[in-house]
Amino acid sequence: MRRGPALLTLAVVIALLALSQHAGKQTAPLPDLRGRTLRAAQLAARDAGFRQLAAADALDRHRVPVLGGNWKVCSQQPPPARYALTTPVTLRVVKTGEACPRR
């Protein structure tokens, strides 16, 4: 019986499992994105390492924020703090010139 290839395969599998578990636990500080344009906020979040970004109309008018420079961030979920890089980030926005809704 040849143990060499089987042990090598087992070692590779264990190493890959360890790496995948470590990758899911990487964290970074999510900055305060309020008051920025949607585009600037998205760039700042991406620069911090966050990739799961969404934008929603803060006035609940069902508008789709398309041009990031024409929208202003009113709030974010989750709030600024340290999170896993896999954490989804939602930015609630209004069109530039509109007032943010009261909480």
Predicted regions, residues:
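Ligand-recognition elements built from short beta-strands and adjacent flexible loops
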Residues: 1-103
